[in-house]
């Protein structure tokens, strides 16, 4: 995230954002004013009220299925589903509470065999006890658990 972007998000009262990819399962408060100097320990800035929601390229359909100049794409949908389910299982084993964000683009996931995989995936997560919610609701749940002081 660009330095000015954080200022603008805070200035315009954004509640959450999800571009930093700082954690796979735990939301956290975005810091402002970190100091990074060569050959020196990092100095952390102050936490802001802005909540960073977890997101990861490994839980995004685009890198797995679409061809780019650096990736072949067209992975087997079932192997992607297996990885995504295992990510959820790992989260439930290793955290007391967490959020896992799966990013699905209509033009990527919306192909026949991938839609069938998505149906199986949602059913499997339901069987494993997943709660499905919008990102703004998940951010509010985090905020209730970890109020900004």
Describe these PLM feature segments.
Residues 74-149:
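C-terminal domain-boundary segment and adjacent tail
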Residues 1-96, 146:
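Active-site-adjacent pocket scaffolds in enzyme catalytic domains
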